[in-house]
Amino acid sequence: MTKKELKSTRDGFGEGLLEAGIQNENVVALSADLTKSTRANLFAEKFPKRFIQVGVAEQNLASVASGMAVIGKIPFMTSFAIFSPGRNWEQIRTTIAYNNTNVKIASSHAGVATGPDGGSHQMLEDIALMRVIPRMTVFSPADF
């Protein structure tokens, strides 16, 4: 029997995002100043022209992603759950869901196990917030 190497879900996201970018040139990635933490750096290093760093501007992250979807791109936006959807929920509701744009929202660091980041980075309400938005599909991966 072979022992499977365990990886974090954010590592799985980074590898999956990179694979999606290889398979489809319309895939773009956006980050709100947490590129390495969410592992979007794997995509950014391979496809720098298809990566946008919006800085600490989570509301703008959602609006830019929605605009890119309107012109035919497939945006994957990444941040910690406390910031997206925690900080930009209204933009997600209005610019992404209301307009029914094809935006993928990937949030890491949900729950209370945020390590040294502490209470200011804990998010317990992310799934509840997203589930009430019409046309929103929510996945919560457990293993990679």
Where do the model's predicted regions map?
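Thiamine diphosphate
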Residues: 1-144
